């Protein structure tokens, strides 16, 4: 993943630098002309930037103002003042929205700040500038090769802006910012090569940070396209179950997870025991979630079937097991399987400290009374 992005960057840097896009008109007999000369001749970045600021302050409407801003962007970049470089870039793009090279310089300045908001803004603006530049016709004063190089640069720059958003999303520490950067990348290019590379590592990072809400957002983006990641299926299905939302989707994702883990080959390098444990976890939870949905819908036969299927996989997980046993007791009572209803209810009561125990005990007492079953 990283190498592809760096490859784009290397290509961009390898292109021959074009002559400055903006022209300068100097009349050395005027104060402004002399100041322009000083700007052009000054090699110290900080001093060049200061001279450019002076010119902008004194001659804001001069015909060479774009050239001054162009010099200012590069001077501030060289002087390691990214905020000032972005400010100058903003002013220059207001004059020339198709200046892709200046936009690129401002984007690099934004990346230097590691500020996800700044990177998002400048990735979009640079993308816009690159698209304009890629469509720009050859001007009368351009050589054919120069024009082709600029168009090629613009196309590569467009791809680089996608990489910039992708890299920023990976690096962002705030889950909301990760999602915002991903969504910006989706908006700019829904088929970007970097989207597919970004989803899983960002999902994993959000999960590790305990950011369930944003994990669900990322997972749903992936599941809308393909459903072959058991972690994402589980996170979204469990979230919907907990929030009591979209029961049909919970059932669909649970079924998909069960089917996926039943047929998915063991990854290379994973021990057999570890893989069986993982499969059991996902298949057990999948059946359990299905049973919970069917129980809330009073669909007792499918609830009974789902929970019975879950039992072999959830032994030792008292939290899941207690719920499964409670609802198995209820379902079998409704299905007139009285002895099974008693058996499952007794097993639920026997699990100490579980939240279903009191309800199971009441049900057990009522069933025995109704059917005159002696304890």
Language model features with spans:
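TPR/TPR-like (Sel1-like) alpha-helical repeat modules
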Residues: 94, 111-135, 241, 252-262, ...
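Short solvent-exposed coil/turn linkers within tandem alpha-helical repeat scaffolds
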Residues: 58-65, 94-102, 132-141, 156, ...
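TPR-repeat structural position
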Residues: 45, 82, 116, 175-178, ...
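Terminal, low-structured helical/coil segments at or just beyond the last alpha-helical repeat
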Residues: 22-27, 160-163, 267-270, 280-286, ...
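N-terminal leader/linker segments that initiate helical-solenoid repeat arrays
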Residues: 17-71, 78, 101, 121, ...
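Structural register within alpha-helical repeat arrays
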Residues: 35-38, 72, 106, 165-168, ...
């Amino acid at each position: 993943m990283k190498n592809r992005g760096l490859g784009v960057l290397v290509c961009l840097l390898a292109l021959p630098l074009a002559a400055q896009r903006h022209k300068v008109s100097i009349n050395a007999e005027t104060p402004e002309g002399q100041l322009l000369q000083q700007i052009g001749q000054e090699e110290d970045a900080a001093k060049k930037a200061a001279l450019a600021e002076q010119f902008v302050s004194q001659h804001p409407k001069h015909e060479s103002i774009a050239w001054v801003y162009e010099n200012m962007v590069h001077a501030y970049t060289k002087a390691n003042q990214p905020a000032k470089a972005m400010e100058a870039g903003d002013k220059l793009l207001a004059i020339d929205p198709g200046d892709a090279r200046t936009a690129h310089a401002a984007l690099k300045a934004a990346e230097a700040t590691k500020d996800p908001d700044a990177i998002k803004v400048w990735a979009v603006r640079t993308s816009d500038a690159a698209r304009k530049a890629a469509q720009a016709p050859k001007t009368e004063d351009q050589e054919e090769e120069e024009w082709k190089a600029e168009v090629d640069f613009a196309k590569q720059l467009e791809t680089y802006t996608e990489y910039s958003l992708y890299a920023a999303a990976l690096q962002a520490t705030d889950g909301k910012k990760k999602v915002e950067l991903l969504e910006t990348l989706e908006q700019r290019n829904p088929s970007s090569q970097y989207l597919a590379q970004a989803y899983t590592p960002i999902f994993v990072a959000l999960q590790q940070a305990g950011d369930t809400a944003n994990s669900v957002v990322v997972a749903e983006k992936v599941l809308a396209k393909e459903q072959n990641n058991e972690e994402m299926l589980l996170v979204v299905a469990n979230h919907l179950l907990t929030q009591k939302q979209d029961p049909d989707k919970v059932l669909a994702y649970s079924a998909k997870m069960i089917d996926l883990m039943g047929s998915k080959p063991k990854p290379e390098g994973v021990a057999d025991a570890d893989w069986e444990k993982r499969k059991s976890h996902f298949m057990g939870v999948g059946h359990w979630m299905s049973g919970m949905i069917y129980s809330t819908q009073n669909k007792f036969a499918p609830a009974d079937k789902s929970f019975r299927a879950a039992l072999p996989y959830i032994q030792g997980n008292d939290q899941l097991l207690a719920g499964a046993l409670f609802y198995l007791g209820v379902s079998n009572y409704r299905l007139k399987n009285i002895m099974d209803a008693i058996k499952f209810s007794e097993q639920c009561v026997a699990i100490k400290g579980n939240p279903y125990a009191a309800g199971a005990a009441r049900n057990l007492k009522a069933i025995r009374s109704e059917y005159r079953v002696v304890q």
